[in-house]
From Swiss-Prot:
This is Dihydrofolate reductase. Changing M20 to I/V: Increases catalytic rate 2-fold. Changing L28R: In strain: B[RT500] isozyme 2. Substrate binds at I5, D27, R52, R57, T113. It comes from Escherichia coli (strain K12). SUPFAM superfamilies: Dihydrofolate reductase-like.
């Protein structure tokens, strides 16, 4: 099963200049909980913004210009990325925008964090048809001392 995991502000903004323009430790914990011990696929820009392999996960970098870091697996196509994951129950696609666009048609599940923030962004989550998805989990949280904005975790499964 292919799943996408993303944090989205208003207007589906997911990033600005290779960074997330908010401070939500709870979302980072949600991300870790849902990706640990699963292969993660990301684009080169996302890889560069993280700066290191995510521990406890097979890191697969999709790029037309593969790098030389041998701590991760470099691939040039969506099919190659899927094959590099091996026989696993769930593959997690973690961004960025172009990689989400490439995998959305193949995805069966979306793990979304909806952030109540209007922020400037240069990267967006692809538009998706809500009628194609069923919400199977939703959990709202107010902003607090650690988390700069209110947010809602949601899991959607393709109908």
């Amino acid at each position: 099963m292919i799943s996408l995991i993303a944090a989205l502000a208003v207007d589906r903004v997911i990033g600005m200049e290779n960074a997330m323009p908010w401070n939500l430790p709870a979302d980072l914990a949600w991300f870790k909980r849902n990706t640990l011990n699963k292969p993660v696929i990301m684009g080169r820009h996302t890889w560069e913004s993280i700066g290191r392999p995510l521990p406890g996960r097979k890191n697969i970098i999709l790029s037309s210009q593969p790098g030389t870091d041998d701590r991760v697996t470099w691939v040039k196509s969506v099919d190659e990325a899927i094959a590099a994951c091996g026989d696993v129950p769930e593959i997690m696609v973690i961004g960025g925008g172009r990689v989400y666009e490439q995998f959305l048609p193949k995805a069966q599940k979306l793990y979304l964090t909806h952030i109540d923030a209007e922020v400037e962004g240069d990267t967006h989550f692809p538009d998706y048809e809500p009628d194609d998805w069923e919400s199977v989990f939703s959990e709202f949280h107010d902003a607090d001392a650690q988390n700069s904005h209110s947010y809602c975790f949601e899991i959607l499964e393709r109908r």
